[in-house]
């Protein structure tokens, strides 16, 4: 809020401040605006209310001042009067209809303001006009919260007397008692508790009033609460007690009081941290730590991640506290979950004094920690040279590697502090040592662009052309130092984008310095790694323009030669990763811009595929061809740009194309850019291609148009754009399917309706594909009810045409009962008798698949139960042969299917059930057979059901057959033709037994 000069204000405002009613009357008489606004949108009435001058307020209101005017914080004159505790001003404003419920931007009413400012008399005037004193502000706080927060006992008394909810909570579930306890208002705390406030109440994070008082060091409130017998070790959601909170905030007086009252000094929180851990880490926790240690706190207790209090002092460099812990039995070489001792942690964070304390107390400098690293590794890695000096000791094997084979010199090279490197080298560190990947310290220094480290290592004899296990030299790593990673790291420290960019530029200059130094010291830029890439490839891949310029200048061999042996050229790598500046450097060399990678792709193809517009523009400006096809998919850069919807790249490519047919170029599958754009749903790309007059009716090798693909993939806006181009809707693919077939199959009812209207207006419209299936077949097969309704609105679909496996068959075979109902309702029940080319009815299909509900639906529409197909089988036979017990049950018991019907091989339903080993089906059929002759009925092989059941091991069925009079002496065809003993069902049964 700005502070305004009174002399700069209107005369009326100055007169109000001077308190002269006569001058005010004179100014008003001279038509001075009584509702004038200052820069904060405050009116003269706000001023008078602030001053509490009732007479002037009355005068202004009678002269037309708006009594409920709001400033830019939405404060009314009543808010101002209440804040000034002027009872008379409040009464005058209310007399003139001031809104007692008005809210400011924080949703605070005049009562909130009165409560916060101890305006008791004003509150007494306002409260009778309110429906409730428990109205909350934006933070959920009531007037009682504000009164308690500010310690106004009289106001708290008034509000409680007027019905304020003593346990009302704000949006963080904090009560008035929390706020009073936090602020140390003992009288208010006592008053609230005496009026029934819940002393053990918790907010959303589980903090009690005791936690609140302890956190802010309110010792008197803490004592009062403890005297009331509150649970001293009550925890919040993080498992922290009041003692934890007091230690964390360095409230030593509270800590002392809590300990005296018996608080558990070793209580762990959810992460296993005790109050001692917090005291060890806290900025002001030194005295707290002393108190805890002197009162029996376990100095070696470890958290869930293995950290002891000594570890915590090491993180934050609390060396005095570390001495206290050690003197009281703290284990110096205690390890955490990662294997780190306090010495490792202190080395990691560079706390030299603490390191000195630990070493003096006998800490093991050669103890292995995370990844088997020494404390010296961590100090060197984090560039703490003074710590390194402290950690070096006589007899220490300085070249001992960690888990990955890295020595301390490797760590120092990665950390970038040249003093660490010099210190280690002077102590005998071997710069020839390699890690498990074959990398020397020089590789690490180069990868992190630490120029002075590189300089020191090379000067002392490091081999600049030493290769690691992947064949990479320091030059490879310097050329590939990741600017994007460095940018991310820098971004955490710099919010300003300009500063961030400057930092990035400095880092790239440092990379160039490193590269230049290596080249000056005979680094060979033509050395290739095991994949055939040299330093130029790496610089291109990571977009280092200056490094590229330097390498190209220093490389005697031609640029094209550098590509041999590599799967991708530097041009490909720069284009793929979007490094247009690096690309521009490469383009200055006389190279073939259409050079291909191992898959035949050009740099332009890769740039277009990734959507790097600036790279695409640079390449086409230098003459790169947009028509080169790769070796695999035969796509062009046009196809590549469309696949991922990179419309800007596509536009650039189309604008450069001389040939108008470029827009319809095809890949190996015959797909045009338009087809791909539609298939992937890239609306802007589709719009651009149509604008460039792409052929909407071009077909691929499968005969599909863009419309086919759009409907298959379901991209609505793309399809709509194609339809607006008068695309052919009856064009058939290689299987004879039109877009209507696909719309019906995919359930796109809206498109289907639109396509139908267009199709029916054409004279020659054939709705059958190569197998005779119509859109209605496909809609029924896939259960698309909305599409079926659309199709049945057309007369031509209310009769079955095409493949004799009718739409009803299609619906039934996939258990789409609702679709079948639609067909039966729209046509008539006679369709239940239709047959496919094998003579099977829909009932056969239902029985075959055991779709019981569909079966019942067909039977309700008088489906012929005993109709036989071309092989003489009824629906019952079909169900029995396939073991569909549900269908058999309905057909036998409800539909009373004929059990005597025989197929071409004279098999009855019972024969078929037994032949496939379907015991349940056989028993269901047997239950309905009473005729002994049917039990002994023979098929073409002279086999009775008993033969078949016995041969298939159906013991229960055999027993039931015998019980119903099956003949055990019947002879089948095989037995009658043999010369040996006759085989009867009886012998088969005996074998089974």
Curated annotation (Swiss-Prot):
Repeat found in the keyword field: yes
Start-end of each ANK repeat: 7-36, 40-69, 73-102, 106-135, 139-168, 172-201, 205-234, 238-267, 271-301, 305-334, 338-367, 371-400, 404-433, 437-466, 470-498, 531-561, 566-595, 599-628, 633-662, 669-698, 702-731, 735-764, 771-800, 803-832, 838-867, 871-901, 905-934, 941-970
Domain of life: Eukaryota
A Pfam entry, by short name: Ank_4
Segments crossing the lipid bilayer: none
InterPro entries xrefs: Ankyrin_rpt, Ankyrin_rpt-contain_sf
UniProt entry tagged with the keyword Repeat: yes
Keyword annotations of the record: ANK repeat, Repeat
Reported function: Putative regulatory subunit of protein phosphatase 6 (PP6) that may be involved in the recognition of phosphoprotein substrates.
Descriptive protein name: Serine/threonine-protein phosphatase 6 regulatory ankyrin repeat subunit B
Organism: Homo sapiens (Human)
